[in-house]
Amino acid sequence: MRFCLFSFALIILNCMDYSQCQGNRWRRNKRASYVSNPICKGCLSCSKDNGCSRCQQKLFFFLRREGMRQYGECLHSCPSGYYGHRAPDMNRCARCRIENCDSCFSKDFCTKCKVGFYLHRGRCFDECPDGFAPLDETMECVEGCEVGHWSEWGTCSRNNRTCGFKWGLETRTRQIVKKPAKDTIPCPTIAESRRCKMAMRHCPGGKRTPKAKEKRNKKKRRKLIERAQEQHSVFLATDRVNQ
């Protein structure tokens, strides 16, 4: 009787060991299949056709699409155009919803724009907004040089004189209100000049120089000659009519 009980106990123990061995063997085979399949790397649950369906705790689940096929992956960081969204059940890669964004911190805050676009306060622009200047080294919009309003046009002058010439220059200016964030960013023009007609061509009480007198006399002689030629032409025309 004792021998029968002892034999039965051995059979039960062997069955338990066998079941445990079979379970361990199944788990080892499952882990081995994960390792042998590249898309199952980092997965807690994976299939050959659909890839990962659950990821390890610190990894992000990403649903990759290739043509008509899609499969899950577990990644340490999300690819371009996606950001990592952590959640209690499983971390996921979510798509950036910002136009022309290459990498983002969240769905509405970009950290890097696509080529040809400038980053400004979490958005991407092809041209920086007013008051900001493009910094090509980092493709960001930084605070530019801010200037005030133009002053009124100054007095028309030439050689620091306001008389004695027919034409002169008048100038207006504006002040730099805020310096740019980078010294390499230029400021707009803060002074500009234009041609103007002087109010007084001859200075009061001034004496004309010999050169000015000669020029004036030449002009008078030229006008007298032109007038005489006109009168002579009229005389010839009248004479022909009378003949």
UniProtKB/Swiss-Prot annotation:
Main location: secreted
SUPFAM superfamilies for the chain: Growth factor receptor domain, TSP-1 type 1 repeat
Swiss-Prot/TrEMBL keywords: Developmental protein, Disulfide bond, Glycoprotein, Heparin-binding, Secreted, Sensory transduction, Signal, Wnt signaling pathway
PROSITE patterns xrefs: TSP1
Secreted among keywords: yes
Ranges for region Disordered: 204-243
Signal peptide (UniProt feature, chain positions): 1-23
Basic residues bias locations: 204-224
GO molecular function, one term: signaling receptor binding
InterPro entries from the UniProt entry: Furin_repeat, Growth_fac_rcpt_cys_sf, R-spondin, Rspo_Fu-CRD_dom, TSP1_rpt, TSP1_rpt_sf, TSP1_spondin_dom
Superkingdom of the source species: Eukaryota
Cell location: Secreted
FU repeat start and end residues: 90-134
Disulfide bonding pattern of the chain: C40-C46, C43-C52, C55-C74, C78-C93, C96-C104, C101-C110, C113-C124, C128-C141, C145-C187, C156-C163, C196-C203
Oligomeric and partner information: Interacts with WNT1. Binds heparin. Interacts with LGR4, LGR5 and LGR6.
Free-text note on domains in this protein's UniProt record: The FU repeat is required for activation and stabilization of beta-catenin.
Main function: Activator of the canonical Wnt signaling pathway by acting as a ligand for LGR4-6 receptors. Upon binding to LGR4-6 (LGR4, LGR5 or LGR6), LGR4-6 associate with phosphorylated LRP6 and frizzled receptors that are activated by extracellular Wnt receptors, triggering the canonical Wnt signaling pathway to increase expression of target genes. Also regulates the canonical Wnt/beta-catenin-dependent pathway and non-canonical Wnt signaling by acting as an inhibitor of ZNRF3, an important regulator of the Wnt signaling pathway. Probably also acts as a ligand for frizzled and LRP receptors.
Family, as annotated: Belongs to the R-spondin family.
Protein name as annotated: R-spondin-2
